Design a protein with these regions (language model features):
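A short SAM/SAH-binding and catalytic strip from SAM-dependent methyltransferases
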Residues: 65-78
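Conserved SAM-binding loop of SAM-dependent methyltransferases across substrates and taxa
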Residues: 7-18
Length: 280
């Protein structure tokens, strides 16, 4: 079961391996493309449902081995409620795949956005128009070109730098709390948040037999112990687990930064996260 499948390309991959696919795509303009894509791989019979409903109104009594919700869940006002809703579609031992804009990692995108916004203000340019894209290319395209990516620079500019929905971030700790309430545990992530088994004897399977909440708690502590490595995308020596005080300070800073970029006043002063800057 996949919500918001767009053209259904990912679902086609699963269907090519024999999966029966149920798709929920509220943009009905995409339905012909979805059917066409399944016809191309000769798997139209594997497309068991193509619904025009939104996640909010979709109903089905069937349970699924795999539920996929990518690209929008964190932007919904009642995302906690809908997380529980999609969890209820899972069979026992089923897998839920989501993605989200991380409430800490987004700091670097926000800094780029605020640089672009200030440059636009100084030049009398609309932040969300094509002239803004031209300035963004001068600032960021060179570094962007070095990345392994699936979208072009204009798409990234539109989706991330100037998009108000980019401020709708989520945090691992909040997702794990929701997982506990649905008896789910974090199985894997990209990047890898759980490094608990990287530097110990491979037979020490620490999480075997534990409750979902215990596994999630263990994962969160591992995440804190490797926070700088995740944030800066490289291996760093972190002597101790990052404290809740530092995380809260950084969280407040990022939230205010996001609000000021997309909804607020650039002239308003934002206090620097001093305790976090100590780690830099």
């Amino acid at each position: 079961l996949e919500f918001g499948c767009n053209g259904g390309e990912n679902a086609c991959v699963l269907a090519s391996y024999g999966a029966n696919v149920y798709l929920v795509e509220p943009n009905k303009k995409m339905h012909d493309l979805i059917k066409s894509n399944f016809k191309k791989i000769k798997k139209l019979n594997n497309l068991k449902l193509l619904s025009k409903d939104s996640l909010e109104v979709f109903k089905n009594k069937k349970k699924f081995d795999l539920v996929v919700v990518e690209g929008f869940l964190n932007t919904l006002k009642k995302r906690n409620e809908y997380f529980k809703k999609i969890s209820n579609f899972l069979k026992p031992k089923g897998i839920l795949i989501i993605n989200y804009d991380d409430g800490y990692g987004v700091i670097f995108e926000f800094l780029k956005s605020i640089i672009l916004l200030k440059a636009c203000k100084l030049n009398g340019i609309n932040f969300r128009k094509n002239d803004s894209l031209k300035i963004a290319k001068k600032f960021f395209e060179k570094e962007f070109s070095k990345l392994n990516k699936s979208r072009n620079f204009p798409s990234w500019w539109k989706d991330q730098l100037v998009n108000p929905y980019a401020s709708k971030t989520w945090k691992l700790k909040d997702i794990l709390k929701l997982s506990n309430s649905s008896n789910l545990y974090m199985y894997s992530t990209s990047p890898i948040f759980d490094k608990s088994s990287h530097f110990q004897w491979y037979k020490n399977l620490t999480l075997i037999g534990k409750k979902a909440s215990d596994k999630n708690s263990y994962i969160l502590e591992s995440w804190k112990s490797n926070f700088l490595s995740f944030l800066f995308n490289k291996s760093l020596s972190q002597k101790k687990k990052i404290s809740n005080k530092v995380l809260i300070e950084l969280e407040v800073f990022v939230n205010k930064l996001g609000r000021n970029i997309f909804f607020g006043n650039l002239k308003k002063k934002i206090l620097k996260p001093k305790n976090f800057l100590y780690y830099l």
